[in-house]
Curated annotation (Swiss-Prot):
Subunit field text: Homodimer.
Species in which this protein is naturally found: Rhizobium meliloti (strain 1021) (Ensifer meliloti)
Pfam families: OMPdecase
Cellular component aspect of the GO annotation: cytosol
UniProt keyword annotation of Lyase present: yes
HAMAP family found in the cross-reference section: OMPdecase_type1_B
This enzyme's EC code(s): 4.1.1.23
Positions bound to substrate: 14, 36, 63-72, 118, 179, 188, 208-209
Keywords assigned: Decarboxylase, Lyase, Pyrimidine biosynthesis
Keyword Cytoplasm: no
Protein name according to UniProt: Orotidine 5'-phosphate decarboxylase
GO molecular function: orotidine-5'-phosphate decarboxylase activity
Reactions the enzyme catalyzes: orotidine 5'-phosphate + H(+) = UMP + CO2
Length: 234
């Protein structure tokens, strides 16, 4: 796994239009190599943009959080492989993960199991009908993802150290909810700074609003990369 901060920082293009996303990518230039595209942008022309971004040499994390019957998940993954993106999320349900792994076999697509959304706290998990607290549910799903042959896990930085012990050193551990010191949490409930997340065992950090909504996105990305480089060099 690369030790470069630029290979580990994923900028979340949580924007309403492709035009705005293109502007951010242009502004960040060669400073940022990896971008995340989720529902908001995907359903506004972002899937074609994802193909173009991947074709241009950038890495793309397609955050679709797939979950459906086995065959539907498999067919979806087969077509996503053709897009040339680097990462894809699906909810960490055993049958869905096994189908996705088989569909992606032989490709370079890294499949990520989503454990528990970083916007959820213990009450949210209870309200959703689970008997586990968020931490226990994350660990259970991490083990299931490892057993299914997934390429990595998505979890909050709070669980990163415990998850890393379960999945070992080879799987990716992607952490959203990253906020530089002093930044607003927004709708995230389980957050951590870039340096602390890396020290906890995260391999990739997803940063959205602190960069794309910053007065100077390029300066914001450079500050976060510097913090990451400092943490990685220790």
């Amino acid at each position: 796994m690369s030790t470069s901060a630029r290979d580990r920082l994923i900028v979340g293009l949580d924007l309403p239009t492709v035009t705005e996303a293109e502007k951010i990518v242009s502004t960040l230039g060669e400073e940022v190599l990896f971008y995340k595209i989720g529902y908001q942008l995907a359903f506004a022309g972002g899937l074609d943009f994802a193909r173009d971004l991947a074709a241009s040499g950038k890495q793309v994390f397609l955050d679709m959080k797939l979950l459906d019957i086995d065959n539907t998940v498999a067919k979806g993954v087969e077509n996503i492989v053709k897009m040339g993106v680097s990462m894809l999320t699906l909810h960490a349900y055993p049958k869905a993960m096994k189908s996705a792994v088989e569909a992606a076999r032989g490709s370079n697509l890294c499949l990520l199991g989503v454990t528990v959304l970083t916007s959820m706290d213990e009450q949210d998990v209870i309200d959703a009908g689970y008997e586990y607290d968020p931490h226990s549910l994350v660990l259970r799903r991490a083990e299931q993802a490892r057993a299914a042959g997934m390429g990595g896990i998505v979890c909050s930085a709070e669980e990163a150290a415990a998850v890393r012990k379960i999945i070992g050193g080879d799987m990716a551990l992607v952490t959203p909810g990253i906020r530089p010191a002093g930044a607003e949490k927004g709708d995230q409930k389980r957050v951590m700074t870039p340096a602390d997340a890396l020290r906890a065992g995260s391999s990739h950090l997803v940063v959205g609003r602190p960069i794309v909504a910053a007065p100077d996105p390029l300066a914001a990305s450079r500050a976060i990369l510097a913090e990451m480089e400092s943490a990685l060099s220790r």
